[in-house]
Amino acid sequence: MDFFMNMDPPTVTAQEHKVTMVGGRPHFYDPAPVKDARKQLTAHLLPHKPKEPFIGAVALSAVWLFPKGKRHKHGEWRVTKPDTDNLQKLLKDCMTKCGFWKDDAQVVRETVEKRWSDEPAGIYIEITDLEV
């Protein structure tokens, strides 16, 4: 399956947890921008949710297309933050929550790209069932 989510991709990542002490113990939480990014990704993913979650091994390909502005060319690699592994973690967490698969450990092969783009910006996703 493949689909395109027409959106400004989030630039905050799942690794941006905050910590506070509660009763002498550390309590980790997501700051508001991370919560907003999760909501945005989830809202764009839900219309593409498969009828049944993938079972077994899958390959995930994601192309993150960020609005290029005036300083970059269409298709140019985005070599600035956020890192691809951090972007993917947030995306896979949201895909798991939406029911694309039971556990993101099922993703055994990944391809990730970050590019600057003319409109539309967004995220192109392709999921391949490797069990077939």
Task: Please tell me what each predicted stretch does.
Residues M1-V132:
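Acidic, proline/glycine-enriched N-terminal capping motif
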